[in-house]
Amino acid sequence: MKRLLLVLCAAVIAVPAFGQSVSVKDGNIQFTDKSGQTTALTSSGRDSGPVLAPDGKWVVFVRKVDGKPIATGSEEVEPTELWQVRVDGKEATLLVKTRDTGKPETGIAAFGSLQFSTSGKLVYFVTPAWAVTGAVYVVDTTNRKVRYLFPGSDVKVVSSGEYKDHLLVLQHRYFIGGGSYDWYWLVRSDGKEIGPVGETTENFEATHSE
């Protein structure tokens, strides 16, 4: 009897535990559920950069498209689109297209540093813009409205704690006496600055995460 119990316990311990995740294979987005089963969500062969929403129900990703390269203050970028799809592969929706307007505050050249708000409703991203920094935008996934927020080369959403849903933004700034520096700053989602964080976000995350 004891031997049987030991065998049963060993069998229970040996059962692998999986978390939901997303990946890319041959240019297609894949979703792996909690049981470890992987399903292809797209079939274009041109998709990359998937990010899973906090509720585990939606995925955003970037799709390559044909078209003229988009000029920015730092480089030329091949056109892409930002899409979302449910984890069951249904309701694939185009959210934002790249656009060349000649102005950093309105032009969108790429979709980097994709970050969901904790509600999963908003998606923040960074696009190349000026010579020394990018531009941070946000799109509402429920109505596809997109707007420019502020300059920045990286953006992170604070997922918990006192500053939940605030943003950590890497910005290029200048010293009064000359020279420049790149620091992360804590800002509200409406753009109001809270204060400096530093060259990295490690200390902030260690102090202000639940």
Residue ranges and their predicted role:
Residues 17-210:
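Sequence signature of WD/YWTD-type beta-propeller architectures
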